[in-house]
Amino acid sequence: MKKALIVVDIQNDFCRGGSLEVADGEKIIPYINHLMKTNNYDEIILTQDFHPTEHKSFAVNNGKSVGEIINLNGTSQTMWPVHCVQGTPGVEFHPDLEKNHATHIIKKGMNPEIDSYSAFFDNQKLIDTGLSNYLKSKDIETVEIVGLALDYCVKYTCIDAVSEGFKVILHFNGTKAVNLHPDDAKNTVFELLEKGVSVIN
């Protein structure tokens, strides 16, 4: 059975000192590097949040405060600080991530009108990143998932991977949550278990 590792958004803006810092986000990088080197994956996919300056998920572009939730083109949208803007240092992969192991990179969030948490689709399922077809073309049956952040991009990548017919394993030691609310990480894990995701340490 062929397997792939999906490494979600290990980028400067989500790590220490970044504009949308996930607490201790950079501390999972050694774990991820170890997986990439030792687990004999057939494919290793890196995803990269890759926003234009005018992206509508940015609070400043809507006159809103960070953390507010608005209706954006028919979809509930959390307002975020400006992050992972194309051409800025924040969009780059964290320097400690051994990205030389990657076989494929998926860029997401490029449409300014729709956010894109999942590595497979945007939040309205209008844009397909091509990841599912790529994995299926390589005869991948199992996907293991790590990265940032557990309660957003990792969560929706896991859910979409299940819906696309893959066996999905989340490495809990390879992810961290934003935790806009204190129980978000715990609630996300319970939700993923209910969706059929296996969660391992």
Feature roles, as predicted:
Residues 18-25, 119-123:
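Short glycine-enriched, charge-decorated loop/helix-capping segments at active-site entrances
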Residues 1-5:
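Extreme N-terminal starter segment of soluble prokaryotic enzymes
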Residues 35, 154-165:
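Histidine-anchored nucleotide/phosphate-binding helix
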Residues 144-147, 167-179:
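A short glycine-rich beta-strand->turn/loop micro-motif centered on a GG-aromatic cluster
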Residues 22-37:
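Short catalytic helix/loop segments, enriched in acidic residues and glycine
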Residues 8, 48, 172:
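Active-site flanking residues adjacent to catalytic metal/cofactor-binding acidic residues
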Residues 34-142:
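Active-site alpha/beta core segments
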Residues 78-81, 95-104, 182-201:
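Structural recognition of alpha->loop->beta junctions
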